[in-house]
Curated annotation (Swiss-Prot):
One of its GO terms (biological process) is mitochondrial electron transport, succinate to ubiquinone. Keywords: Electron transport, Heme, Iron, Membrane, Metal-binding, Mitochondrion, Mitochondrion inner membrane, Transit peptide, Transmembrane, Transmembrane helix, Transport. This is Succinate dehydrogenase [ubiquinone] cytochrome b small subunit 1, mitochondrial. It comes from Ascaris suum (Pig roundworm). Its main location: mitochondrion. Residues 26-59, 105-119 are mitochondrial matrix.
Length: 156
């Protein structure tokens, strides 16, 4: 029960409360002993809570995915077909979505834009991704396809 209560209190409030208590206690002991008050230890503070999710895992997946796209793009020049077109469309859409989502997370925060506009920008990123995927799939189905289009560009 205590751990559930501690998780309900934001980390910043717990750190602030702890540091205020330490400062008050340290001020009286420092006045008596002449020693400096204890310093905040961020490593010990991190051990006190468990994060809800890890951004590092998603970052690693994005980097591995980008590295896997390096041979995929030249392979699309040599291998034609619906499967390669679909694979390329999905890979490009996912890669662009992660890039746009990174920009939205950096610059489209509620602190910067306000709650309403920040929510609209986040929804807009998903709409942009859905339109991109729909457009690429439509191009693959009703036109020459991405692999053939790349070949036609290189023939220019």
């Amino acid at each position: 029960m205590l751990s559930a209560v501690r998780r309900a209190i934001p980390l910043s409030a717990r750190i602030l409360r702890t540091s205020l208590i330490q400062r008050c206690a340290g001020a009286t002991s420092a006045a008596v002993t002449g020693a400096a008050p204890p310093q905040f230890d961020p490593i010990a503070a991190e051990k006190g809570f468990k994060p809800l999710h890890s951004h590092g895992t998603l970052f690693k997946i994005e980097r591995y995915f980008a590295a896997a796209m390096v041979p995929l793009i030249p392979a699309a020049y040599f291998i034609h077909g619906r499967e390669m077109d679909l694979c390329l469309a999905l890979a490009l859409t996912l890669h662009v979505h992660w890039g746009v989502w990174g920009v939205v997370n950096d610059y489209g925060r509620p602190f910067v834009l306000g709650d309403t506009l920040a929510a609209a920008v986040r929804v807009g990123a998903y709409i942009f991704t859905a339109c991109l995927l729909a457009g690429l799939l439509y191009f693959n189905e009703h036109d020459v396809g991405l692999t053939r289009a790349f070949e036609m560009v290189w023939e220019l």
